[in-house]
A protein has these predicted regions:
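Extended recognition/assembly regions associated with phosphoester-bond processing machinery
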Residues: 1-185
């Protein structure tokens, strides 16, 4: 079972975002996230995704790179953030996906999940009457817009959000998730 081998994060507050290969970060937004983490005693974690502008996918091969400014934050594996909340950093979903959470409703096996993706999305998942509610969140991205100027790329460019997700737990073990969205200021 993946749950038995899944790494458990240590801490009370985390900031999750995503980054595209071969793309520079939005420096001001990254600086804001780093400052937020310092002030709020949070850990910044970045999930990566691959997008090949030449029209075919070769994710992870030589020639792919990630901005050196975020390398120390990259976590591309499944982790338990808190009880019943998972970081799905192993997922590599194309940024052109119209509905990045499609097909993942049962992926977290009864837990809520945070998925690295450039589009911000939140979905409430069905759960039995007396069970806690389950949610799936996407993060937004810390990297610049960088898409092919074709239909799917133009739509992805429009929906690209400089954003992140904050997850924190209180002293009772209850966790809370909220989204951070970069504005033009």
């Amino acid at each position: 079972s993946p749950a038995k081998t899944r790494k458990k994060l240590r801490g009370k507050r985390f900031v999750f975002t995503s980054a595209q290969n071969n793309t520079h970060v939005h420096s001001d937004f990254l600086s804001s996230l780093e400052n937020y983490c310092e002030v709020n005693e949070a850990e910044l974690l970045v999930g990566t995704f691959h997008y090949n502008k030449k029209g075919f996918q070769r994710g992870g091969e030589d020639g792919d790179w990630f901005d050196p400014k975020i390398r120390k934050y990259i976590l591309d594996e499944s982790c338990e953030v808190f009880k019943d909340l998972l970081w799905c950093g192993e997922l590599n979903i194309l940024p052109t996906a119209a509905n990045p959470l499609s097909g993942f409703h049962s992926y977290t096996q009864g837990a809520s999940g945070i998925v690295p993706h450039a589009k911000v999305q939140l979905e409430s998942l069905p759960s039995p009457k007396h069970d806690p509610c389950r949610m799936l969140y996407t993060t937004g991205a810390v990297t610049q817009r960088n898409y092919v100027k074709m239909k799917a790329g133009l739509k992805a460019n429009f929906h690209h959000v400089f954003g992140a997700v904050v997850a924190e737990v209180d002293e009772d073990g209850d966790w809370f998730v909220r989204q951070l969205i970069c504005n033009s200021d």
